[in-house]
Amino acid sequence: MKRTYQPKKHHRKRVHGFLARMRTPGGRRVIKRRRAKGRKRLTV
């Protein structure tokens, strides 16, 4: 049985990247929360 995590840079960016987050209202909330918390890295 193969492992479940097969890393791909393109997929990672597409799904969890900054632009992907900004595209949806929920994603914008994520960015907002992470900014408020003071995260060094907002996405990926």
Curated annotation (Swiss-Prot):
InterPro entries: Ribosomal_bL34, Ribosomal_bL34_CS. One of its GO terms (molecular function) is structural constituent of ribosome. Keywords: Ribonucleoprotein, Ribosomal protein. The keyword Lyase does not apply. GO terms for biological process: translation. GO terms for cellular component: ribonucleoprotein complex; ribosome. Belongs to the bacterial ribosomal protein bL34 family. This is Large ribosomal subunit protein bL34. The lineage of its organism: Bacteria, Pseudomonadati, Dictyoglomota, Dictyoglomia, Dictyoglomales. The gene is rpmH.
